[in-house]
Amino acid sequence: YAQSGLLAEVHPSADFKAKLSDIGWEATKYNGKQIAYPIAVESLSLIYNKDLVPEAPKTWEEIEKLDKDLKAKGKNAIMWNLAEPYFTWPIISSQGAYAFKVTANGYDAKDIGVNNEAAQKGLQFVVDLVKKKVINADTDYSVAEASFNKGETAMTINGPWAWANIEKSGINYGVAVLPTL
């Protein structure tokens, strides 16, 4: 629509722009022009069962150690939806991968950073977690959600849309930033 000239530039006031995140405003620009208002910004996070993990781990090394301890009790440290790249993207991009290169004029859709060395390093980290049996390669959303909500898994990577089901399940949970690599 923007390329065809079907969208008009919008001019929000400075006061209004200050109420929303810069990343939301940047995501709604085209060729340096503000063509939309950001309506939602969500983020994935580490959701953890406080009864199994009193404090969220800060590193993946902690998660690997925790997984060994929990597996001895018939539980898992972490599961998340590996069927959809969205849920693994924070790990892949943590090494410098990007969907589109950010330029002074916004995003360059011709410069895709999902097959660069940084993306490969991030993805290799996930592959290594599978090889170490910390995670299962065939885990999808429903498997990860059910396991966490039954108290069988200590942590999951998910977003705010998952909180209602977690609350219905009675899990005593916390939300934290994802661990560093």
Predicted features and spans:
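Hinge/lid segment of periplasmic solute-binding proteins
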Residues: 1-44, 55-64, 72
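Ligand-binding "clamshell"
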Residues: 3-8, 31-33, 94-95, 166-180
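Extracytoplasmic/periplasmic solute-binding protein
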Residues: 33-39, 44, 64-111, 153
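Glycine-centered hinge/linker elements that transmit conformational signals in sensory
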Residues: 66-67, 108-138
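Short, solvent-exposed loop/beta-turn-alpha elements that line the ligand-binding surface or hinge
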Residues: 11-20, 70, 98-121, 168, ...
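Extracytoplasmic/secreted proteins, especially bacterial periplasmic and envelope-associated proteins
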Residues: 5, 48, 58, 62-65, ...
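Extracytoplasmic/periplasmic substrate-binding proteins
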Residues: 124-181
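Short helix-loop capping/hinge motifs at secondary-structure junctions, enriched
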Residues: 51-59, 98, 132
